[in-house]
Amino acid sequence: MRSDYCGTLRSEHIGKTVSLYGWIDGWRDHGGVIFLDLRDYTGIVQIVADPQRTPESYHLASSLRNEYVVRVEGRVSARPEHSLNPRLSTGTVEVYADTLAVLNRAETPPFAISKDEEVDEKLRLKFRYLDLRRGRMQKLLRLRHRVMQIMRRHLDERGFTEIETPVLVKSTPEGARDYLVPSRVNPGDWFALPQSPQLFKQLLMVAGFDRYYQIARCFRDEDLRADRQPEFTQLDMEMSFLSMEEIIALNEGLVAAILQETMGLELSLPLPRLTYAEAMVRYGSDKPDTRFGLELVEVSEVFRESSFQVLSGAVAAGGKVVCLPVPGAEGITNTRVKPGGDLFEFVTQFGARGLLFARVREGGQVDTIGAFSKSLTPEIAAGMIEKTGAQPGHLLLFGAGDRTAVPTVLDYMGRLRLKMGEELGLIDPNRHNLLWVTDFPMFEWNAEEKRLEALHHPFTAPRPEDEHDLKTARALAYDIIWNGVEVGGGSLRIYRRALQERVFETIGLTEEEARAKFGFLLDAFEYGTPPHGGIAYGFDRFVMLIAGEQSIREVIAFPKTQRAQDLMLGAPSAVAERQLKELNVRSTLPPKTQG
């Protein structure tokens, strides 16, 4: 029976007989005495096998290899002064092995467990059970557990009830694709895996639970990025009878508690806020990284009368001319900004038709090249400098477009801002800026489907003063942003049937479609639905930022690859024809390409 954990032994344990279990982390033979490093999740302790004291243990120790699982019983002793190891928490003691037993042997691992070295990610994911044995991964997953504990404790203390919601639900696709599950007992019908517990948590408010939370598993069949997985975890919350200000304040307290306990970071509350419009105009993003300046500046009026039609034409068409003033940019060559250059190509992949630039020289002279140069009058040059505050050494980068192209212009200029900030070393990795973005548009235009769609989801309430024209309404929505990453988002919800039906109509749902997809919700609104709102946090992403990692795969025990594959299990995989028949499903793929 285990008496102690390896990493917990200290000088005060000297003289104690202990029983330890763990893995062999290292093996050394020094002058006939064998030293073993025994590891468990708490750390490493040195084991001494001395042939003069216990010949049997010494003989067995000589046959051990790394990652063998062993049991050790022996007495804790003080290390000789010459062998003290300040790098170990147990570096003042060692255990003389009186008995030693091998519980299991191990093959040579495909990568070192005890060394914190770079390993190919595919190899790590294939042997994830070994990857998770490494100290770094142990710390990350235990951090994840700790964050979850803090969340639960904080919400429990404030009257929240944790309630689980179903995983087999109705498919109501709005946005990302659903994962579908065929029903064997109802042939031809399908369940979907939930993209969020959104509707269930609203129904729990109808049911009178007042304050709900859940650490929920969610599923989305979408293309993957560094911060996306097909299955992921949310901290999901919903509250009745609270204003937007009260919900934001409650969540600021939650986030502050988590960051203080895990990082020692003291947040200054209340957090700053930006409206969606402000964030887009100043940063070109609805999730702005405010750790550095380099803000966008609208210079439309400067170019309204310009002879350069690219810019004046955009303004005349109700559009904008946007400038990114980049200081200390002497090292950025014209070649990089011209067609074929990396900065030019960077913005074109996000919809830019080109990238104009000008430089501010000593004495305030502004120069550029090509047709833009010919239109650059002294008045326009002076206007550019006055509007942007540019100094000698500044590189001025311009994007422009008509009214319909403004969102695209702001987006690619915002991305260019981030790229320049990273390249010029303007972003302090040790700084943590959190803020709220509010007043999002209710809807955005889907050019492919030629219809409006909900920017967040169609259950978000509009600002009361905007209800008369839902197409241009602002939402009572709020996202919390951390260093340019959205870690949570929520809103006040619609709780009146008539308004919900108007929103469904605005996004192009017929009355019959709305009834088929959401009839249960509309019916619930007839039975005394309270005002309510909530928020959901991307839990994996939140832990990733706390840990200082770059991918959520680092803080998930068994993640999928960016191709949505589990390399360890070999999933997804083909299934037997018999299983498909039981489900009344037939594959249209040729047999050789299935799976």
Swiss-Prot record:
Subunit structure: Homodimer.
Enzyme Commission number, as recorded: 6.1.1.23
Keyword set, alphabetical order: Aminoacyl-tRNA synthetase, ATP-binding, Cytoplasm, Ligase, Nucleotide-binding, Protein biosynthesis
SUPFAM superfamilies cross-referenced by the UniProt entry: Class II aaRS and biotin synthetases, GAD domain-like, Nucleic acid-binding proteins
Molecular functions (GO terms): aspartate-tRNA ligase activity; aspartate-tRNA(Asn) ligase activity; ATP binding; nucleic acid binding
NCBIfam families from the UniProt entry: aspS_bact, PRK00476.1
Function of the protein: Aspartyl-tRNA synthetase with relaxed tRNA specificity since it is able to aspartylate not only its cognate tRNA(Asp) but also tRNA(Asn). Reaction proceeds in two steps: L-aspartate is first activated by ATP to form Asp-AMP and then transferred to the acceptor end of tRNA(Asp/Asn).
Record-level GO cellular component terms: cytoplasm
Site description Important for tRNA non-discrimination, residues in chain: 30
Source species, domain of life: Bacteria
Name of the protein described by the UniProt record: Aspartate--tRNA(Asp/Asn) ligase
Record organism: Gloeobacter violaceus (strain ATCC 29082 / PCC 7421)
UniProt-listed GO biological process terms: aspartyl-tRNA aminoacylation
Positions of disulphide bridges: none
Keyword Repressor found: no
Binding site for L-aspartate: 174, 220, 456, 493
Pfam families (UniProt xref): GAD, tRNA-synt_2, tRNA_anti-codon
Main location: cytoplasm
Region (Aspartate): 198-201
Residues that hold ATP according to the record: 220-222, 229, 486, 538-541
Subcellular location: Cytoplasm
Catalyzed chemical reaction(s): tRNA(Asx) + L-aspartate + ATP = L-aspartyl-tRNA(Asx) + AMP + diphosphate
Family assignment from sequence similarity: Belongs to the class-II aminoacyl-tRNA synthetase family. Type 1 subfamily.
